[in-house]
Swiss-Prot record:
Location relative to the cell: Cell membrane; Basolateral cell membrane
Species in which this protein is naturally found: Mus musculus
Protein name per Swiss-Prot or TrEMBL: Aquaporin-9
Extracellular side: 44-57, 124-160, 208-210, 226-243
Chain segments annotated as transmembrane: 25-43, 58-77, 99-123, 161-178, 191-207, 244-264
Amino acid sequence: MPSEKDRAKKNLVQRLALKSCLAKETLSEFLGTFIMIVLGCGSIAQAVLSREKAGGIITINIGFATAVVMALYATFGVSGGHINPAVSFAMCTFGRMEWFKFPFYVGAQLLGAFVGAATVFGIYYDGLMAFADGKLLITGENGTAFIFATYPKPFVSVPGAFVDQVVSTMFLLLIVFAIFDSRNLGVPRGLEPIVIGLLIIVISCSLGLNSGCAMNPARDLSPRLFTALAGWGFEVFTFGNNFWWIPVVGPMIGAVLGGLIYVLFIQMHHSNPDPEVKAEPAENNLEKHELSVIM
């Protein structure tokens, strides 16, 4: 028989456990986005602060993509692992998530990204102070703001940067929709995060030059706000012809466009396009995963 201590411990766990599904999902999105930012921006910080002696563009692309993979494995079964307001927006737009959850998901993602940026700043504080004699600069050879948020190259125009964000996020969601389409080739259960990681690597390697390939409003806006408050100043919002809004608005449009293209070109032409008829989930499938991203 369990001891009094074991029963007390079990009762404590039961009391602390969240009962609300929405609360669980919100907490999951916060944690997932936090993981992504700490490990992803951490890979950038390591490369920048070592002046590329401990990393470079390859390690950044692989590091950030792997950070997303780890975040997805941590959250898929609870919230669907969106960790991106653009993904949540697309899921709501195409009826894969209820709209009332949208502000909770986005709020958790924004907060998780902000706390993640603060964590990276704390971990690399000494390195940041030593990098440019204590100066926190946005641009130049001693610039460090792009550890946290994306900035356009000098040759990129505002329209060009906007199209860049729309197109890169369009490809992200187009392929994500394909990955979770049970009537297409699909991906073996449990390997979806790895394939998404590979997708992020190829997008970063092919469409990342112009403005850093954010594809995620939370990944860019919250860390940018943190840098504004932490010492880089509010020039982080005006730099690049007020570039800050482009990684926020562009991915939202691109996400819906990518989903729409997949639906119009592939999904609606399946032999059984009726959305009411769906394959029964296997016993080991996680319900939240099905509710969030099932095609």
